Amino acid sequence: MHQSTLLKPVSCYGIGVHTGKRTQLTIEPAKENTGIIFIRTDISSENNYIEASYCNVSDTLLSTTISNNHKIQISTIEHLMAALWGCSIDNAIIKIDGPEVPIMDGSSKPFVFMIECAGKKLQNAPKKYLKILKEVKVVNKDCELYCTPSEHMAVDLTIDFSSKAIGRQNLSFGMQESFTKNIADARTFGFIRDVEYLKSKGLAQGASFENAIGIDEHDKVLNPSGLRYADEFVRHKLLDLFGDLYTSGISVVSAIKGYKTSHAFNNELLHKIFSDTTSYKFVTSNEL
């Protein structure tokens, strides 16, 4: 298999779920071995670019934020990163004229649609993978996330909320190709009781039923259209996991199991993997 990029640039407009600011985002083709690079076009400086790397993750409160050494940041990258992973885009330049990726409808589906509209181009370089060689695990009280050696990607994820609207949900997923059909349109979610507090902290400024699932104090989903899936909540947590793991720079080949995961946990797992060179190796498709 070869690396891929877009055939042509594609753009969208939208508001940030936390900043409430309207931004334009453009995904552009990039050369082989570039990876995913974000550029803040509203900042006229040669230091306005940030590599979408786990090492550059600076905040994981409610979303994933990346920053560079010059304190320039871009937040809520995970849904776009998941779409790039799900569409097998290895190399892209993301230009954005603000501090946060547009939330769109709260899922990855709009970004998948953009990529499909732009088209995909195969490049003259082998696709690379991160193959896990031994178990790597992160645990915090009853939350855990670990990966073990496998010949292909396989994920088993469980969430457990006290809210009866969500409860305990489990999902197993194995084929990257089915991400766009079965996971990409699962939306982010939140509790109405938390909204005022979050807004007082400068968060959730752009949140609405147009871009998130809202749950009230009676454990009722308030969105007029309801849920897209009975287990949409765990599907979205899986989407977040894929987006966060793609900050490794390449697709991970491993059996992954998680319970009550978070953006912080996802990032911690990558740091732990890369801290031990005996736990992984980089391979091409011919070496899988």
From Swiss-Prot:
The active site is at 263 (proton donor). It is an enzyme of class 3 (hydrolase). Its cofactor is Zn(2+). It comes from the Bacteria. One of its GO terms (molecular function) is metal ion binding. InterPro entries: Ribosomal_Su5_D2-typ_SF, UDP-acyl_GlcNac_deAcase, UDP-acyl_GlcNac_deAcase_C, UDP-acyl_N-AcGlcN_deAcase_N. Coiled coil: none annotated. Catalyzes the hydrolysis of UDP-3-O-myristoyl-N-acetylglucosamine to form UDP-3-O-myristoylglucosamine and acetate, the committed step in lipid A biosynthesis. PANTHER family: UDP-3-O-ACYL-N-ACETYLGLUCOSAMINE DEACETYLASE 1, MITOCHONDRIAL-RELATED. This is UDP-3-O-acyl-N-acetylglucosamine deacetylase. It comes from Rickettsia prowazekii (strain Madrid E). The gene is lpxC.
